[in-house]
Every structure is written in structure tokens, then in C-alpha cells.
Amino acid sequence: MASKSKLSRTRNIGVVAHIDAGKTTVTERILFYTGKSYKMGEVHDGEAVMDWMPQEQERGITITSAVTTCSWQNHEIHIIDTPGHVDFTMEVERSLRVLDGAVVVFCAVGGVEPQSETVWHQADKYHVPKVAFINKMDRVGADFFSAVRMMSERFNSKPLPIQIPWGREENFNGVVDLIRQKLLTWDPSTLGLSYEFSEIPLDVKPQVERYREEMLEMLAELDDTFAEKYLEGSLLSEKDIMETIRKTTLSLKIVPVMCGSALRNKGVQPILDAVVSYLPSPEDVPPMKGINPLTKAEEIRISSNQEPLAALAFKIMQDEGRKMTYLRIYSGQLKTGQEIYNASKGKKEKIARLLKMHANKRERVLQAFAGEIIAVMGLKETATGDTICDEDHPILLEPIEFYEPVISQAIEAKTPADQEKLSLALDKLMEEDPTIKVKYEDETAQTVISGMGELHLEIIIDRLLREFNTHVNVGKPRVVYRETIQKKVDIERLFEKELGEKKHFGHVRLTLEPWERGNGVEFIRQIDGTVIPEEYFGAIEEGIHEAALSGCLSGYPLVDIRVRLIGGSYREGEASVLAYKIAAGSAFKDGCAKAEPIQLEPIMDVDVITPSEFMGDVIGDIHARRGEIQAVTPKGSISEIRARVPLKALFGYSTDLRSATQGRAVFSMQFFRFDKT
């Protein structure tokens, strides 16, 4: 039986970063130093344990979030290694939804990069406490203090260096622990397994004293109890300092910052120490809140085995044709053979197997407890975002919101045999990744897949071939658009029809008006049940949302519209759910056609890092692509250019940028919003 003490010694963390910050290398070192793996897997050799998919090993990037468990200082640490590429941001989002803490990895050369900001804000969205690791201190151009300054400028939480580097670039030899006031160095002959504390060299003592004093001052500013001791001049113990760091980290006031070089096996063990010392256990996070799906009353679950079961399905994977569901258990317990209730679907299911995962390897267990992340076999109906609970104590947790795709591609099966396999394969891929959308076009007899970026689509097509042995012809990528309206209109529709022996009556009056960018379709009822009985309001809203799936210009979904139900009528004995749904959908569609509809295109946030000598050419090219410059930041011999550019204008940009800068510039992009074409 998992006890309360075990809960306090459990950590659920994610390792998140911008692509190429060294995130997976950090995770591989963690597995090696905790004894979980007996060989260091290297990303550049395609041997990283956590990057187990063939596509990950070939490209040297993480595509899917991988789960593992290891031990450190008598604590059990569940780790999710997440992707850094923007096309797979949703993998990070759904991982952070179920995690209690995060290790954010930064590159000492690049500092705060675009995807670093994205994952940081995603963690903030779910109130996830963080520790930061500034990696690659051995690289040319590495600057720990510049990276910390960038963190301070870009984020709400205050970065608190608890270490500073000893040396930099090729002379990076260790770190100084500002809490213990000791130098920490690693023995390269043991691959960094062996490390020691020693006295701080005299030449760096003044710098150490300065940064230690800054650390203590910041803690005193944020914690009154600590401030009293600090201002009185009392002797501050390591325990005093560490307890205050933990307290202010859990309250999201600070982010402890460390440094090292994971590839050179320096600085990783202190990350584990920080995870144990400063990041929360399941007991430290607020109770989970949900609603009772039957009564709509609020339900609360604290992290305890004695509470009724509450778990969230956050990931689906195919395992040799069998469905495997990843769950975060917030309360209660799970056992093999147990019957559970899917509150999202209103269906009962049965646990066939419980598995603890280590990347793509697994260990069968008979029981799982509150606070754990576990894989389950046997849940055929469960989808990502569903709540699993006890039928006698139902609870519905907040589901996971998924991003809308911005790019699509037409595919068609090469042979009739491939056609038979294609639909099944795409269904399974959509079940795994809800950001994949599939649509069949009758006119062209083509299947159109939509995703988050060109790499995302490339991976989907590669997986169709490798995992499902399905051969397809592929069209060129194309942009996914949206539609909206520009003016306010009032519209009225009456549906009256006899179907069989029953009359169907539905009558609604709606007001449609433009809404802020970045929103969907909002439904507001401005009448009460005396005009139209409340039992029909759900059908009216459903009819509007279904009609919004296909616009009146080119058939793209309608967004950024506020719909008010302002009137209508009711006829006793003839009113029906179907009639009100049809009337509302028809009114919405006709209203949009009269409200000056326009097309919206996806706009991307683009971040270019270029040698300063090419800055003018890069900016000129962005303007030529209808882009708007947001900021230009000089960083020594290079410049960072931030811009917003239509996605349509960015096809082939990677090749053009390389040509314009002699291959010396790099860029990244992520979705901003849909806006006027």
C-alpha cells in the first residue's frame, strides 16, 4: 500500500526546452546517474533511450513525449521527456497538464529562445513550479549571466541563481554551489558519476560572495520569516536557505537556476537534488477540482489513496496494434481487472493490464496509486482528455484543449489495398494525436490531412509507411484558412415541416456580431424559458456550432463570432429538438452570408537569429513576405529578429534564408493567430 510518506517522496516532472537546448541529453544523463540505464544514450548517435521512435533517432529530435521512472535520494521520480520542436508543442501541453513540476533547459549560447518562452508560458498556464538548467556551458559563446538576464526580462517569475559556473567555454570545469559555498567538480574518467565538493578558489571568491548576497537578498524580499533572520544578521543555515527556496519555488515566485554541460557529464546530479528539494510532491499541489457529471456540483479530490478514484487520460499510443492509455492518477487506486467509469463518455470499462513505462519498455504491475503516472491496457473507449473515476463517486475533470491545425496536405492511397489500410491507420494516428485532422474530399477523391507544421505532416506520412505499411501519393502542403464576419446582423429563421405523422416546429431570432481574434463561436442566450423552453437551448447551440464548421465562402470553419439568441417562438405539441437545431443552423449560416464574410489566414510568430551583417537582407525579405517586424535585438555579432508573417509566405523560407545568409542564420516559427488575408 502506498503511504502518505511515499506520496511526499514522489515527483512528477517534465523536462522541457527549445529544440537543441540539450533536453534529451539531460534526461539520458539523469537515467544513467540514477541507475535506470547502464549506458549513456547519445542523441547524435541515434541511441537516446527516450527517443525510441525511428523518426526520432534519424532526425536527432524528440517527437513524442516519453515516460520513465527513476529513483534519487529515496524519492521516486516520474519523468516525461517532451519535444522541443514547435510542431509538437501539443505534446508538451498535454504533458504539463498532468505534471507537478518542470525542469526547463536553456542553451547557454542562445539563452531564452522562442520555444523556451512557449513552454515556460505553458507551464505557467497550469501553475507548474520550475527549476532551470542552463546547459552547454562548454560551448563557444556560452554566457550564464546573459541567459539569466534574458530570463528576468522575458518571464514573470524571478530567476534565482543557486550556482554560478567555474570557467566558461572550453575552460568550463565545474560549478560553485552558492548555498553550500563549495566548488563542485566532476571526474571525467567515471563519465561524471564521481564528483566532489572542495573549497572555492581564491580568485573567484569575490564573485561568489556577490552572487550569494544577491541570492539571499532576493529570498529576503520574498519571504518575511527569512527576511527577519537576514536583517538581524543571524547565521543563515543551509536548511534555512533551502526551505525558503522550496517555499518560494512552490509559490511560483522564483525559479532556481543551475548550470552545466550535460554532454560533458557536468552539472546533472544537482538537477536531481533540486527536483527532490524544491519541486512539489503530489501532496504539495492543490486538490483537483471537477464537477459531478450528474448533479453539476463541484467535486474536490485530494491526493490520497483513500479518496475515490480520479485520473486523467493524457496520452494514447499504439503498441503492436493494441491501444495503450497513459493516466495520471490524482486520487484513489487502480488494480488489474478493476472496473472503472469513464465520466467523459458515460461508459464503464475494465483495466486489463497496468504498466510502468521506461520509454518503449514496460514493467507489469498489479496496482497503481495516487500521484503516479501509469500506462493501461484495455480501455477501448477512452480518448485523450477523458476522466476515469469511480462510478459511485463520479467526477469530470477539466479536459485538455487542443490546438487547431494550420497546414494541410492531400494524400491518396497508391493501391486499393493501401486504401483499405489508410482509413484505419489515420483513425489510430488521430486517436494518438488529436491535433491531426482528416477530411475526405469527394470532388478530388483525396484525403486531406491537417497538422501543426510541415515536419508534423512529414512524420505522419512516414509513420503511415513504417508502422502501417500504407503507401500514399503526397500533394504539396497548403495553408488551412478560417472565415469570419465583419458586421453585425439580425437574422430570423422558422423551420416547420411534417415528417411522417409528426409536425416539427422551431423558430429562432439571432444577432451575429464580430468578436475578438483568437476566439471561436460564442453562444449567448438573452431570453428565458418563457419564450422558448430551456430544453431546446442545447439544440440551438449545437445547431450553431455545427453550422460553424463550414463557412459560406470556401467552406473553412467560421470563427471569432458572437451569437446572441434574442427571440423566437414555441408551439405546444409541434416543437422538437431537431427543428430548433435546424432553424438555428440555417439562421447562423444565412446571417454569416449577409455579414460581409472574409477569409482569415494563419499568422506565424517568426524568430530569426542571424549574423548582424545580414540583418538588413533578412528584414527586407520578411517585408517582401508581408511580414511585420516586432523587435530587433542585437546580441554581440548576431541579431535576433522577431516578426509576424503569414504562413503562406513561409513555404520554402528555410532554403531562402540559408541562401541569403550563407547558411549562417537559423529560424523558428509558431502559430500566433488567424487574421485577415
Feature map (PLM): residue ranges:
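Structural and coupling elements of P-loop NTPases
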Residues: 1-677
